[in-house]
Amino acid sequence: TLLASSAASDVYKRQIVKVAGLTLNKVPECNVSWTNESTKLFKSSDISVAVAIDGGLITPIVRNVEEKGIHKISSEIKELVEKAKNGTLLQNEYNGGTFSISNLGMYGIKNFTAIINPPQSAILAVGAGQKIPTVNDDKIVISNIMNVTLSCDHRAIDGAVGAKFLQVFKKIIENPMLMSL
């Protein structure tokens, strides 16, 4: 779950939320929900962040992520998590998200599959970052690697579209300067 646990993880998770919002703008076919009548496409990226609370889980929403800076996203997440923990979230603060993120990485979990939060059609599972040796310009270097998994409702999002989302997400998260474009 996305929770405030340290300054480093706070920076990391707000970047993930921002990158997901930017990615949804570039791959709007993933910013959808399935209904019995049709697939509903959303214009704004309203990201639900999973928060563990006593007795379960709740998913407060950071709305219009694509329009906000990382510091604004961070302050909203902090406020929403606090309200979730205190049981003071208003219904409109946890209903109506268009996409979810679940982060078990903060518990050291490297890889997992998250369950879609209906009526949304996708959820991004974020695993723990780990330092591993990689090859860069024919040299072995230590890199921070994070596993993410995208679960999609295939009635609304085809596998190829989900793969496109992950490609764009990877490109942006690995090139942070793209967040400001």
How would you label these PLM feature ranges?
Residues T1-L2:
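Short, well-ordered junction/capping motifs at the entry into regular secondary structure
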Residues S6-L181:
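C-terminal catalytic/motor cores of large multi-domain enzyme assemblies
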